Amino acid sequence: MSTIDERVKKIIVEQLGVKEEEVVNSASFVDDLGADSLDTVELVMALEEEFDIEIPDEEAEKITTVQAAIDYVENAGK
């Protein structure tokens, strides 16, 4: 089984169509990876599906970097 970190990064690569090496923990979805608002919504939906969690809109707005996505998923499982 892949780690949460690896699974989140795989989803980001698939959803945003970016290279794996671009998906570093500090990368901003919008500024560094070229995502737009629709991309970020689809990314949150993919995370919800992959990890079987629900991310409220107000929380989703705070998930703006790769690390923020990893942290949210890790904490959602607690």
Swiss-Prot record:
4'-phosphopantetheine is transferred from CoA to a specific serine of apo-ACP by AcpS. This modification is essential for activity because fatty acids are bound in thioester linkage to the sulfhydryl of the prosthetic group. The lineage of its organism: Bacteria, Pseudomonadati, Pseudomonadota, Gammaproteobacteria, Enterobacterales. Keywords: Cytoplasm, Fatty acid biosynthesis, Fatty acid metabolism, Lipid biosynthesis, Lipid metabolism, Phosphopantetheine, Phosphoprotein. PANTHER family: ACYL CARRIER PROTEIN, CARRIER DOMAIN-CONTAINING PROTEIN. This is Acyl carrier protein. The keyword Lipid biosynthesis applies. It comes from Proteus mirabilis (strain HI4320). It is found in: Cytoplasm. Carrier of the growing fatty acid chain in fatty acid biosynthesis. GO terms for molecular function: acyl binding; acyl carrier activity; phosphopantetheine binding. GO terms for cellular component: cytosol; membrane. GO terms for biological process: lipid A biosynthetic process. Belongs to the acyl carrier protein (ACP) family. The modification O-(pantetheine 4'-phosphoryl)serine is found at S37. The keyword Heme does not apply. Pathway: Lipid metabolism; fatty acid biosynthesis. It comes from the Bacteria. Residues 2-77 form the Carrier domain.
